[in-house]
Amino acid sequence: MNSSRSLLALALLFISFLVYQQWEIDKAPKPVVRETAVSQSDTPNSSSASTSAVDSQAKGRVITLQNDVFRLKVDTLGGDVIESELLNYAQELNGEERFTLLENKDGTTYVAQSGLVGKNGIDSAAGRADYQVNGDNFVLAEGQDELSVPFTFEKDGVIYRKIFMLKRGSYDIAVNYEIRNQSDETIEVQPYGQLKHTLVESSGSMAMPTYTGGAYSSSETNYKKYSFDDMKGANLSVNTKAGWVAVLQHYFVSAWIPNQDADNQLYTTTNNGMGFIGFRGPTVTVPAGATETVKTALWTGPKLQNQMGEVAEHLDLTVDYGWAWFIAKPLFALLTLIQSLVSNWGLAIIGVTLVVKAILYPLTKAQYTSMAKMRMLQPKLQEMRERFGDDRQRMSQEMMKLYKEEKVNPLGGCLPLLIQMPIFIALYWTFMEAVELRHAPFFGWIQDLSAQDPYYILPLLMGGSMFLLQKLSPTPVADPMQQKVMNFMPVIFTVFFLWFPAGLVLYWLVSNVITIIQQQLIYRGLEKKGLHSRKSK
């Protein structure tokens, strides 16, 4: 396989990847789910108070809770988190306004609801618990590692405390219930948590698609997306040990994590243009005079793999690298390591490219050596075609015999190509999913490596490097039509890369430059062995 055909094969693989990716987004089969087993009496769904009672704007007091990474707003009516402002992330590049994940304004609803339902639940069709809080604004103080804020509600001799606990440097919120039964009767309640989101379509383009929708984890499924279209098609109902539910968007996620030692039910429903994905825990029985505690957790923030993996098992899988995850994870670890040394994500990408090309160099050398040997055999192969042109079986036998005698692998030029494409796909998803690259500058005009080059300079340079690499490759294609196709390859790639993240284009550009250097070094060595001639280009 010569260089021109390698480039053509790479282009076909690349285009196939884009087409397959878009097909997955538009035509993915809907998950098979069970539509029963959800009790209408006490489960948070479209007909119960846990959703319908909070379909309007906040009606209670709004309490502010803040640590060093986010600012939350909690409605005292029900104790729902109606806003989360992420202090370390800007809404727009170089903007002063902070990124708001949870919000309930301007026609957009995305809130984290939770409460107690069941036989003696305080969240029902009749209304929500109206909690009392001693203050309006709570901020984690300097030198303090945790901030605990109790919301208190009393009914029929039972004191309910919904306690929000924020930790320094963490987007993980403990949302615990303390139920003190001072009545003469045994009571039963069930905890629930759900994310309520306006039903929207996933956005993005063919080059940079983004997913907005639900996801969940269960004992049988480590991670599965459940889109808003899925929710409209059928209600999810999954009984599981542990598990979690989430709503994903580009770079950010909110997730409810129930008690991981309990048997929980995960569910979805839709109502009045809203999608709900949540959990319902097991019934908690509190005898007269007793006190019980129920533990849940809420994550609302960026997709930080290391932190999320510590909060709940498989929550880090919301950073979705697709089928190339086994390559993407070590690449991201390497990228992070280099960035910690050079303090620039663009330089880190260049560093990763150098490492990848160094690892692949033996295969690259083998590829060019194989192609050089194939070129040396062309006169003999042409002679065989003339001798056995009408006898394809005999010609194939003679060709294989020749390859064996000359110790040439006719497919030797394919292996580096087949290895390089999965690495490219893994890097693509790394750049698409890693929130660390969001608004990460390189230098000059590249101020966001996760977005396309605003002036298209990098794609043009990449196209130029591909054109140069093609011209420096020996043995031009003889077929005129194939030659025309090859001449257009750099143009086609350049057009595709106009809308790709600048970080990915940077990788491809640097990779091409390194390939050109490696190519010339390899050719010099082959010249000494008589396997290459500069005149053959």
UniProtKB/Swiss-Prot annotation:
The protein's UniProt keywords, in alphabetical order, are:
Cell inner membrane, Cell membrane, Chaperone, Membrane, Protein transport, Transmembrane, Transmembrane helix, Transport
Give one Pfam family, short name only: 60KD_IMP
Quote the cellular component terms of the Gene Ontology held in the record.
Answer: plasma membrane
Q: Which locations, inside or outside the cell, does it occupy?
A: Cell inner membrane
Membrane topology per the record? Multi-pass membrane protein
Span-the-membrane segments of this chain are: 6-26, 341-363, 411-431, 449-469, 490-510
Example of a GO biological process term: protein insertion into membrane
Major localization class? membrane
- Tell me a Gene Ontology molecular-function term this record carries: membrane insertase activity
Spell out the InterPro entries in the cross-references.
Membr_insert_YidC (IPR019998), Membr_insert_YidC_N (IPR028053), YidC/ALB3/OXA1/COX18 (IPR001708), YidC/Oxa/ALB_C (IPR028055), YidC_ALB_C (IPR047196), YidC_periplasmic_sf (IPR038221)
Family statement drawn from the similarity comment of this UniProt entry: Belongs to the OXA1/ALB3/YidC family. Type 1 subfamily.
Q: Which NCBIfam families match?
A: PRK01318.1-1 (NF002351), PRK01318.1-3 (NF002352), yidC_nterm (TIGR03593), yidC_oxa1_cterm (TIGR03592)
Matching PANTHER family: CYTOCHROME C OXIDASE ASSEMBLY PROTEIN COX18, MITOCHONDRIAL, OXA1
Q: What is the annotated quaternary arrangement, including any partners?
A: Interacts with the Sec translocase complex via SecD. Specifically interacts with transmembrane segments of nascent integral membrane proteins during membrane integration.
Q: What does this protein do?
A: Required for the insertion and/or proper folding and/or complex formation of integral membrane proteins into the membrane. Involved in integration of membrane proteins that insert both dependently and independently of the Sec translocase complex, as well as at least some lipoproteins. Aids folding of multispanning membrane proteins.
- Could you tell me what this protein is called? Membrane protein insertase YidC
